[in-house]
Amino acid sequence: MIYETAPAKINLTLDTLFKRDDGYHEIAMIMTTVDLNDRLSFQKRKDKKIVVDIEHNYVPNDHKNLAYRAAQLMMETYDLNEGVTITIDKDIPVSAGLAGGSADAAATMRGINRLFNLDKSLHELSDLGIQIGTDIPFCIYNRTAVCKGRGEKIRFLKKPPSAWVVLAKPNLGISSADVFKALDLDDAHHVDTEMCEKAIVEGDYKQLCESLSNRLEPVSMSMHPEIKKIKNNMLQCGADGALMSGSGPTVYGLAQKESQAKKIYNAVNGCCNEVYLVRLLG
């Protein structure tokens, strides 16, 4: 049996530049990981089936599951003659903007690579993974990075300054497609990705917090005002910086001191069912 860990990601920045001819948006973003993980195990089957074993009411176990699709892609690409059972122990909240599904898919690709002794590089897996999800290339590596294009153009950065992270997911669902559809690409405001990168390179925690930015945030907030309330609550309770991750709805707050982070955690715990106190991994 093979084991893999799938950490959640957060966006430190997210900018949308223009809509491409293929229908996707050209993006530029900086992402990193936190120590909130799904855990996966992989075991060969003789019947060539893909079986996803997951005890979660809101997560499918068929082709709608990204881990299933990742396994299917690996089996078809590398002509595997055995199946696989994938067991997922899930802690990352679903439809949260934390790339939980993409992290599971990336872990599945790494796991099958090891299980079947395919000896494929992470670069090869990343190039393959973009076929089923824009966050999968980043999740293959699980390293702080600038991601451009659809997410497949990756440039690694050093780890960001250490910090506590409070993650809060409000009790609502959000459609990434609806958020991108509502985005005004003629809006002149763009995210300063370079400022955030400079803060990471120089280890400047204060500048990092000041440079957190997500072009999708005001769009999601206009659809769901609860997101803005959570962010404001975090900042009022002492977060050094706060931002919505991805297309939402999860908001995170950064703090250098554990006592500070616990205060933020307690402040938002009453209004959200899913609140986590974790650390930056990078």
From Swiss-Prot:
The active site is at K9, D135. GO terms for molecular function: 4-(cytidine 5'-diphospho)-2-C-methyl-D-erythritol kinase activity; ATP binding. Transmembrane segments: none annotated. GO terms for biological process: terpenoid biosynthetic process. ATP binds at P93, V94, S95, A96, G97, L98, A99, G100, G101, S102, A103. It comes from the Bacteria. It catalyses: 4-CDP-2-C-methyl-D-erythritol + ATP = 4-CDP-2-C-methyl-D-erythritol 2-phosphate + ADP + H(+). Belongs to the GHMP kinase family. IspE subfamily. Catalyzes the phosphorylation of the position 2 hydroxy group of 4-diphosphocytidyl-2C-methyl-D-erythritol. This is Putative 4-diphosphocytidyl-2-C-methyl-D-erythritol kinase. The lineage of its organism: Bacteria, Bacillati, Bacillota, Bacilli, Bacillales.
